[in-house]
């Protein structure tokens, strides 16, 4: 088996380079180095870690355009999307620096239960050790910083495994981390072969795994990890609900931004649209009108809104889901056009609620519309999926918003916004097969730490 792999630009298949997998012996050496680095990390003060993360934020800002260009070349996402990603990565680094200074324990009196004994408990948060951070292709730098930042802030060491498609951007990111002051025995980059993944996940020197990606890979990680702490951010089948009192102009803009941006390749994309019957035709017509004007093409051009999906295989999967929906009775309001790895923005009507495109995660620029009469009608349809990440609703009725908040199986409901809403200091994560644990810098620090108690 070859120890190298080649990468191409999804837009035009131009070569991006040839890279080497990390041999198993090197992985073991990296883990030994990181285990040794835990000792020095424990002696590094929180304000020192915060200083490193602030320096990293400054470097990310300085190299933002260079990194955004790499992201676009690697993933096919538009340069506009990549620039937004770099802004988010900068924010995540700043937030990690701020939260590094806020890791605080508590003291507890023991007299709440008899016999009290006059003791006091001092509870502190301690790092887990070495965190294996695994990131997907679609937000290679932003998600990496959402893992590396809080892991480092908490005092852990990090083995960073990016998606293979993102090798060049990951190499630049690690270089910037070193330049910011992270020692090499605190952060290592690896690109293991597929055959080595299970034993890497099971390795005794990996103390926890922080993974963002698909459910199948997460199942393999869980099976190999044993009793390791897991933070899993997985897929979503996120609904956007438009009530008859919702702002249609804002709702159509949100639908487009939360579905067709990044060519629909985001776990929090608006993958299913539920439109109240009283405004269905008006919403559909406005949505089709706006979507038909989106520029599809070269992702390096500033006016391009939709680039290619990550590869031809991904495009074929989306096409299959669309064709199955049409076979199930759906009609095409817009799109259903394909060119290489391009899937043109597609809007489907009359979609069966049991069609695969409504039940499974569709990772591409396709938007199924469902007309409904009442909230009670759609709650079981929305919940009829293995996922439960986020949701969005457009309504002026607080009672409706609260009912959806209580009844939907999701981690977040965004009122008068799309399901893709996320900011660095909010908790992020879902229920069911959308994952385990919560990201968001403060919450991720807790996930990658444990409590240690001194009784005196």
Curated annotation (Swiss-Prot):
Pfam families: Aldedh
pH dependence: Optimum pH is 9.0.
PROSITE patterns to which the protein is assigned, alphabetical: ALDEHYDE_DEHYDR_CYS, ALDEHYDE_DEHYDR_GLU
Enzyme Commission code(s) on record: 1.2.1.73
Domain of life: Bacteria
Active site, UniProt feature: 233, 267
Keyword line: NAD, Oxidoreductase
Binding-site list for NAD(+): 213-218
Catalytic activity: sulfoacetaldehyde + NAD(+) + H2O = sulfoacetate + NADH + 2 H(+)
InterPro entries referenced in this protein's UniProt entry, alphabetically: Ald_DH/histidinol_DH (IPR016161), Ald_DH_C (IPR016163), Ald_DH_CS_CYS (IPR016160), Ald_DH_CS_GLU (IPR029510), Ald_DH_N (IPR016162), Aldehyde_DH_dom (IPR015590), ALDH-related_metabolic_enz (IPR051020), Put_phosphonoacetaldehyde_DH (IPR017656)
Signal peptide: none
CDD domains assigned to the protein according to its UniProt record, in alphabetical order: ALDH_PhpJ
GO molecular function: lactaldehyde dehydrogenase (NAD+) activity; sulfoacetaldehyde dehydrogenase activity
Enzyme class (EC, first level): oxidoreductase
PANTHER family in the cross-refs: ALDEHYDE DEHYDROGENASE
NCBIfam families tied to this protein: SulfactDhSafD
Family: Belongs to the aldehyde dehydrogenase family.
Function as written in the Swiss-Prot or TrEMBL entry: Mediates conversion of 2-sulfoacetaldehyde into sulfoacetate. The enzyme is specific for NAD; NADP is not a substrate. Part of a pathway that can utilize the amino group of taurine as a sole source of nitrogen for growth.
Subunit structure of this chain's protein: Homotetramer.
Name of the protein this chain belongs to: Sulfoacetaldehyde dehydrogenase
Gene: safD
């Amino acid at each position: 088996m070859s120890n190298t792999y080649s990468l191409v630009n999804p837009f035009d298949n131009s070569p991006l380079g040839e890279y080497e997998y990390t041999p198993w012996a090197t992985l073991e050496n990296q883990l030994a180095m990181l285990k040794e680095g835990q000792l020095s990390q424990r002696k590094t003060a929180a304000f020192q870690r915060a200083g490193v993360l602030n320096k990293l934020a400054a470097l990310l800002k300085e190299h933002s355009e260079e990194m955004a260009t790499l992201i676009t070349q690697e993933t096919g996402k538009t340069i506009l999307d990549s620039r937004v990603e770099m802004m988010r990565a900068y924010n995540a680094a700043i937030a990690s620096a701020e939260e590094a200074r806020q890791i605080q324990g508590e003291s507890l009196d023991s007299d709440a239960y008899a016999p009290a004994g006059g003791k006091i408990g001092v509870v502190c948060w301690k790092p887990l050790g070495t965190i294996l951070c695994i990131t997907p292709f679609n937000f290679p730098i932003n998600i990496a910083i959402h893992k590396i930042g809080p892991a480092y802030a908490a005092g852990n060491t990090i083995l960073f495994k990016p998606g293979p498609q993102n090798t060049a951007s990951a190499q630049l990111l690690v270089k910037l981390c070193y330049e910011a002051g992270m020692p090499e025995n605190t952060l290592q980059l690896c690109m293991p072969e597929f055959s080595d993944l299970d034993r890497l996940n099971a390795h005794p020197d990996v103390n926890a795994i922080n993974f963002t990606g698909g459910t199948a890979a997460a199942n393999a990680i869980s099976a190999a990890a044993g009793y390791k702490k897991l933070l899993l951010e997985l897929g979503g089948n996120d609904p956007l609900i438009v009530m008859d009192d919702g702002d249609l102009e804002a709702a159509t803009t949100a639908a487009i931004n939360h579905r067709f941006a990044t060519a629909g390749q985001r776990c929090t994309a608006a993958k299913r649209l539920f439109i109240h019957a009283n405004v269905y035709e008006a919403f559909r017509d406005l949505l089709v009108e706006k979507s038909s004007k989106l520029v599809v093409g070269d992702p390096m051009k500033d006016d391009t809104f939709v680039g290619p999906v990550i590869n031809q295989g991904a495009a074929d999967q989306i096409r299959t889901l669309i064709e199955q929906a049409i076979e199930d009775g759906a009609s095409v309001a817009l799109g259903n056009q394909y060119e290489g790895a391009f899937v043109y923005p597609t809007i489907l009507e009359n979609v069966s609620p049991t069609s695969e495109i409504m039940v499974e995660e569709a990772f591409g620029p396709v938007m199924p519309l469902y007309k409904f009469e009442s909230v009670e009608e759609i709650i079981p349809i929305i919940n009829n999926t293995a996922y439960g990440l986020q949701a969005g609703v457009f309504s002026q009725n607080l009672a409706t918003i609260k009912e959806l908040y209580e009844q939907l199986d999701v981690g977040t409901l965004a009122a008068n916004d799309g399901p893709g809403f996320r900011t660095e200091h909010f908790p992020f994560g879902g229920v069911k097969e959308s994952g385990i644990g919560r990201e968001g810098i403060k919450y991720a620090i807790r996930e990658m730490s444990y409590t240690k108690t001194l009784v005196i």
